[in-house]
Amino acid sequence: LQFMQEQNITEYDQLSAKAEDAVSRFHALTEQLRRTEADLSVTSELMGAVVRYAKTRPVFDGYKAAKYSRKYLAEHEAELADYRAAKATMGELLGGEKLPKMAELKEKRRQLAARKKALYTEYRSAQEEMRQAVAVKANIDHLLGVTDGQRKKEQER
């Protein structure tokens, strides 16, 4: 009852609407948080691929200068495999787009991390609000002896 008084809820329908809104808001924030985490993961993976590519590029240039020598390939097989993997990862993550500068990637990662932190704070408060609203609604339903099935039958009458 205290929750209902704090929220100025006097009708059962208001309580139902409040609970539905809280659940909707929570699910929307969950989805935003998931998307932000996915973007952050992709950005970090791309940054790692760029670093690996830059470190192994001189080995590939040496391989090319040696006219794709089998001997050079045998000596530097691991580095060349890492180079190819980094290049493939960048191609896959960029999807044909131009490679952004490392400073831009760092800034994007910083912005995504800040957004994730802000969303997570909002997510926690929305989660608590949802739990409260759903618990109060469940308690009121129990006190009134109303379940979803009984309520539907009453509406059909």
Which stretches of residues belong to each language-model region?
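Extended intrinsically disordered terminal tails
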Residues: 1-157
